[in-house]
Amino acid sequence: MTTVKTSPTTLPLHPLIHQLAEVIISHWQDYLDLSPYELPDGLGYVEGKLEGEKLVIENRCYQSPQFRKMHLELAKVGQGLDILHCVMFPNPDYALPMFGCDIVAGKGGVSAAIADLSPANPELTLSNSYNQALSQLETPNFSDQRELPEWGDIFSEYCLFIRPHTPEEEKLFLKRVGDFLKVHCQQANQSQPGSTQQREFNIQGQEYYCRKQQQNDKTRRVLEKAFGEAWANKYMTQVLFDIPNH
């Protein structure tokens, strides 16, 4: 079992990003049997320039029997933009949803915070066990709910997409993500591998999710400006949203 260091990064990031990274890593370590996941060469730590400012990307990747890849990305652009991005990709032998979480923070505070357990099957539906567990969670109220992107049909009814305006709302967001992770890890530990046909359905669901996420023009534009089109495409398709083998 892999032991993960307490602080996922040495980058000076927004406090909410540090706190969320620690929540994510601690849940992984507490509930799952982690082992290292090797990223393509040269993509674990990346430095570049974006409009004259230094861009640093740090990636942490693990795997477990139920998850083929658990990816935590932390990025900083100059002194004005901090980013957290996390996705847990299920082992396609298991019929599990996709946990995803992102935070974007600037000098004015957190501009976007999103978390979801997104269906990864052709029907785009969560299982009864997930619906039952998630429906029992306390639903927090936030003052600034944001609209999902046009390609956002991959998200579940439990998706949280907000702009937190107070420390209290930031704490509520942290708790919600922790609740999602606890449910997800507990459900994963109780799950059993499915049939060959179910595996194909699971792969189709992950592929649909990844293709939709690859349409995120904002992420692609930032990467292209800093590293060029070819590198950006490689990073989008091999690190951020890689598709499992059939």
Swiss-Prot record:
Keywords linked to the UniProt accession: Oxidoreductase
Signal sequence, renumbered to the chain: none
Catalytic activity line of the entry: (2R,3Z)-phycocyanobilin + 4 oxidized [2Fe-2S]-[ferredoxin] = biliverdin IXalpha + 4 reduced [2Fe-2S]-[ferredoxin] + 4 H(+)
Cell membrane among keywords: no
EC number: 1.3.7.5
Keyword hit for Plastid: no
Gene3D superfamilies membership: 3.40.1500.20
Function as written in the Swiss-Prot or TrEMBL entry: Catalyzes the four-electron reduction of biliverdin IX-alpha (2-electron reduction at both the A and D rings); the reaction proceeds via an isolatable 2-electron intermediate, 181,182-dihydrobiliverdin.
Name the record gives this protein: Phycocyanobilin:ferredoxin oxidoreductase
Organism: Crocosphaera subtropica (strain ATCC 51142 / BH68) (Cyanothece sp. (strain ATCC 51142))
